[in-house]
Amino acid sequence: MLQQTRTLVLISLAVTFLVSSQAIAKKKRQYFQESSFTVDFEITHPIIPISIKNDDNKTLLILGILKDKEQTTPLLAVYKKTQDSLIYEIANKIIFPESTIAFDTLKLQSEKTIILLLSSSQLSTLDMETGSIVKLSDIDSIYLQDKPQFIARKKLVKDVNGDGLDDIVIPSFKNLNVLIQHKEMRKRLDENIIDNFYVSQLSIPAVVDMSSSQISFSEQKYFTQDINFDGLKDFIFVKDGKLTAFMQREKGLFSETSKIVELPFEFSGLPWWLVRGADGETADQSDLKHSLLEDIKDINGDNIPDIMVRKTISSGVLDREISYEFFFGEEKNGLLTFNKEADTEITAEGTLSDLKLIDMNNDGKMEVLVSSFDIGVSQIIGALMSGSIDQDVFIFSLDENNSFGEDPIFEEEVSLSFSLSSGQSGQPVIISLDTNGDLHKEMLLSVGEKRLNIFRGQDKTEGNEELFSSKSKRHKTKLPANGNMVIANDLNQDGRDELIMRYGKQDDEELKNRVVILSAK
């Protein structure tokens, strides 16, 4: 009897140990440590992490609305980290002026960060600590709403001349307003802050799209690159199918007259659906060939600007091929030159979209992250029945000959969901970030709405040319239906990125005021 009892005890202990071990193993499989907090309003915008002077931890700016019966009030909430490494608490809450159309963050030379507000006729600054609003300047812009329906986060601020200071760029109908922050600015914010900027206008008009019944205006896309090899960034845009540049001169300002940069290949600065014929109609998609200049930046790591062109060939609405051509810049006698034919290109089955240029392994060369999906009749019918469509994620890398291979170095599948009843579509999570501070980015992909797969970045070694591990780590969590609501940022500035998640209208009601932070263990 004693022997039987002892045996039962041993079996019980073994089972307990096994179950406990499995539970611990399951717990260890979680890749991130999670923390969360809730706010007392509905979050409406992507969360904005910003650096604050003399603070190792970044501050979170959270935009949303307060609902009171039939009235909604837009507000900005400032959240700061407490002593606990993952907990954020409210520091200030500010109501936006009802005339605010758009906003951005602006860092002054004193390293103080303020909010830039744009209305239909003026620029103002908002102090996040005091809530005070100060007029910066009257401004002409293409945004002519006195009481906008919503507030947009727009890219109003950019270091356009490469001096390390934030500048302001506001499009108007005929010109581009450029406010250059100069190094002689005072170390404090006061009512004369406009004196800290050189105000100028570049002859870069808005993009006009006109049909027989309406006309619309949009921002002109621009680039800032050094194209004359004087060490200064120049202001570049596409005009009438030609590359046009305003050269940088003294004090970080730009020349008043533009210069044409001759290129040996044809391209457009407008997507094909904005190009109209003599009859005012858009292009015939049964016989369409179009090349759009997508980006100008150094891609192959030689510190010379390169050009990326998106090429579209269509023989029907459901029969379209999209590829990307890359023209690598060269310096000849102080001039930026390109070959007539593309140096390399990227093609893949399906329709390519959402291309991003990212240096995945910190070698100075850009990898290409791009998605692909089929839009044939059978795929559309299948998607309507299932409520989702498969989407491939590819990463292409330059080889030793500065050529993108025919096959991607990374290929995985995610799903894009949509609802016929609500008309809303979900987006998968597709994010690159460095979770362990080794300067090699990981790839994060969602699997449904409850799991992330993490493919660890790694060094290329002899016999192993892979940038990512073949097997993924897993993390289970409640993901937002819209993967764009997940962002990556190094919140405590330790070289390791965190994930910040919020939720939207496609998610459960109780999640709409919740913020989740994921930090690698």
Protein language model features and the residues they cover:
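Coiled-coil-like amphipathic alpha-helices with heptad-repeat character
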Residues: 1, 21-22
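Bacterial N-terminal signal peptides that target proteins for export
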Residues: 1-9
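Beta-propeller-forming repeat regions
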Residues: 22-521
